[in-house]
Amino acid sequence: MVPVDLELQRVLVERMDVATTRTQPKSLSLPNILTYARIAAIPVVIGCIYAQSILDYPLWLRWVAVAVFIAAGVTDYLDGYYARIWNQQSAFGRMLDPIADKLLVASCLLMLAADGIIHGWSLWAAMVILCREILVSGLREYLAALRVSVPVTRLAKWKTTIQLVAIGFLLAGEAGDMVVPVVTQIGLLLLWASAIFTMYTGYDYFRAGIHHLIKEDEG
């Protein structure tokens, strides 16, 4: 049997949790704060790579960029995890989360292209990824106006994971090659792999989108 004082304490804690949930804006929930942190990490990563490659600052800045990028990638997992287990899912979070992902990936790809790490034929892989993200974002926005939800598939999650791992290797760049000589090459191979996944998942989204568009025109 639970003592009275412990039972009273439990009830008070539960009521405080309910009150906090009611008074705290959903935009300030922990999952959304983690998403904000991911967006805030972007200028730090870009600044480190710019300072090292363009301004010729020390190579250790690349490791700082990699560390911040990894932390940003971890928040991509944690925000969804905490939103589910704490029941803090919100329309604002569902809107902002994919935007944060695309900003992070696009910014890093553009910086790596400017740095010369992504060059030659590998630029095509980067362009495939960027164009797909733009097109899918436009499709999602249009379908949202029709109140049609396009869920993220498991394959799309794998695509994002491969993208983030590829970019992590490429951010290490010359600094990584000094530790393991093939770091940049591994990053470029993973970039092509993510581009292939990107095209396939993009096709899935467009097939689902076109299906809804045809139904809308016929209805």
In which residue ranges do the predicted regions lie?
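Alpha-helical transmembrane bundles and membrane-interface segments of multipass inner-membrane proteins
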Residues: 2-219
